[in-house]
Structure formats: C-alpha cells, structure tokens
Amino acid sequence: MTLREMNMGEMDSPNEYDFLKIAIQRGLVTEQDEIAQFKRIESGRKGENAFAEIIKQFAQENWLFKRNLWLHDFSDFECDYLLITTHCVYVFEIKNYFGKFEYRNGQCKSRGVAITYNPVNQAHNATIHLRNLLGGVPVKGVLVFVGEHNQVVIHDDIDYIDILCRNDVYQYIQDIISEEKQSAIRIDTQSIISKLRNQTINNPYAIEPFASADMTEENSGIFCDRCGAILTMTRKIYINCQCGFEEYREHLIIRSACEYSLLTYGTNFTVSAIHNFLGNVLSRNYLKSILQKYFTELPSQKILTFKNSSQNNVNQIVFDKPNRIILHQNRSYQ
C-alpha cells in the first residue's frame, strides 16, 4: 500500500539533519558541540525513519501523512508525524532512546539521568494545539518510543495521550483500521488540509546557509553516497567506491549539485560554483550540459544561472541508468 504525503507548501529551508550531514562531511562544520548535536539529530532521524517504515507497511492507502510539520497556534510547535485517516487525526511524537526511560511525577529520566525536555508534555502540547486549529475534528496524541533497546517505565497515570513502544505500533495501526471501519464519523480531509496549510510555518530554528565564498578548495571533491569515502572522478559511466557501491556518473554529479544547493539554499547557482564544489575534476562544457539537462535555467542572466529550490532533489529525478552495489561474487544488485 502507498500512503499519500500531504503538500503543505513549506518554504525551501532544508532540514537540519541533511544540512549538517553534508556540512560535516565537507569540513564546513568542525566544532565538537555541533558534531555532537548532529549525532543526536541523527539518532532521532533514524527513529523517525523506522517508525515511518512501519506505518508505510501496514497503513491504509487512503490515509494521508506529513512528517516534521511545523505549525503555529499562539506558539510554534512541531508534529513529528501527522496521520489523517477518514475518522481521526493522529499526531505522533517519536523518541529513539537507548536503555531505560522512566517517567515519575512529571519528571523524565533516561538511563538514570534527568532530562530537561519532557516528551510526554511535547506529545500532549502538540495534541492540544491541533485540536485548537481543527475545531471539532477528533485528534489523538501518541508518544512512540521506537528504540530497539529501550525499556519504558511510566509510573504516573496518563490518559490524555497514548504511549507505545516499538513492538506496539503494528497492533496500534490494526486498532486504527478497526476503529475506522466501525466509526460513524467521517472527517472532511480537504478542510483539514486547508486549515493546516494556513497555519504551516517554516522551521523557526532553520540554520543559516553557507555563501558561495565559504566553499574553499578544502571543502570540494566527490564522495561516496553509501559510505562517505572520497572518490576519484574518472571518464567511466560508473564511479566506483571500495565499499562496492557504483554510482552512475550523472547521478553523482547531480547529487553533488543538489548538496551544494542545500548548503546554499536561497541562492541560485552557476556552472562555476558547481565546478569548484566538485573539485574542478570535470570540463566546464560537459558539466554545463549535465546541469542544463536536470536543472531549471533562469532567464535574462548575464551568466548562466540555475534555480535553487527544494525541488532540486536527486531522489525525485529519474535517470536512465541505475546505481549498483557490486558484491564479491561479481553479481550486481540495484
């Protein structure tokens, strides 16, 4: 089954995880506190991805979803995962903790250490805000502890949100399906989407983009999309990495250009900028032809310039050849 993702018309700022991953790889971010912050974000992203895969596997095809949606209702708040069925709206707060999480008297501890943020309150607040925005539409708040090695102990009575562990998610989805079939309620999905769009905001904590001048020779080059190793550009159709990943040459070029677009979001880019970003390893004419093939040119520019937008996503582009992983047995797999 294929869930449908809602288009809420957000602005073009990238998410912090993608931005920092590329910036750290290219040496644009080197401070240890920023790298530690990235590790925390990475853990959260892995948890959200794991949850999204479970939902995708078992959800109904007529349901709608949106990840990491920022909304405003007197104050700004984020919905980690918003799910709209035909009878109810569900807002999921997702936590990827390791070890024991304990909740007692409104206080949280993770592996015996008190933590300042309160995921129970986060889930409850998002639920209250959504109910305010959507009027009489049924809204349920759910806190999901998705960590594989996470023990959750809740001492307090909590009846205002549902609390799940990873192994509970499948059955929770089955319960939603059963409730949907039995419910006499049918909500107006288009009205809900319209209300949400009116209150959608860009991430208020968006990070500052880099300028083209920030990109030096030290930050240039090409990297493996699978393991992050530095690669050597060749004239072959596929660029090989020692990890076994073979990336289609055009895919590698466009992926790198998309990474540049992300790091400098809000600013359009030129052939020269991408040429430098790749480490000057391609002829300008060849690079120009590839960029013209996949990106939108801006008219009336003295220098050939391409539009930088959130649509510059290599995963949304269809290439005429696939990437490959070559195993020791010399068999290739998509």
Where are these regions (language model features)?
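Surface-exposed interaction regions that form or flank ligand-binding interfaces
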Residues: M1-F77, V113-R284, K288-S289, S310-Q334
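Catalytic centers of nucleases
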Residues: W70-V91, K307
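Short beta-strand element of the conserved SAM-dependent methyltransferase core
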Residues: L83, I239-C241, L304-F306
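Active-site beta-strand-loop-beta-strand hairpin of nuclease catalytic cores
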Residues: L83-G106
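Residue-level signal for tight coil/turn positions that link beta-strands
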Residues: T86-H87, K236, Q301-K302
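Short acidic, glycine/Ser/Thr-rich loop/turn "cap" segments at secondary-structure junctions
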Residues: R104-T116
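Short, solvent-exposed alpha-helical "recognition" segments
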Residues: I290-P299
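Short Lys/Arg-enriched helix C-cap and helix-to-coil transition segments
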Residues: L298-V314
